[in-house]
Amino acid sequence: TANNWMHMMWAGSNANEYYMSFRLQNNTQVGTITTNGSSTTYTTSSDYRLKENVDYTWDATTRLKQLKPARFNFIADDTNTLVDGFIAHEVSSVVPEAITGEKDAMEAAVLYVEGDELPSGKSVGDVKFPEQIAAQAIDQSKLVPLLVKTIQELEARITALEA
């Protein structure tokens, strides 16, 4: 959005080290992508100084039980490889912060790039572009705290039952 920006720079003494920083308008860093030539790291800022209203008492087990892991293949995958995952719009009611996009959204297919030649006498506004799926996506990392908290809750229940 207009309130956010990305900063990219080369960092470090090694020419193969790259750094990309994502920041809010007030310059608060919210994430980075770094690489050193042999690995890439994607991070989301998690510093306590950036947070408020911290609550450690929420019920993760109840929320986790609402998720429906599925096994499926992607239509565009000619190999029909089965993968484990989730359906984004189903997850959105349980962990909305993990989902981007809108259910059933469509967008114009990008067929024109500036500099491409258009049909004679036509301008970009005259050209009708076919629609394509504007796919929803899941940030799987947003599910990890739910998993950890559920394990802690279940461990506490086991300990209580064994006592």
What are these regions (language model features)?
Residues 45-163:
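Intramolecular chaperone/auto-protease modules of tailspike-like proteins
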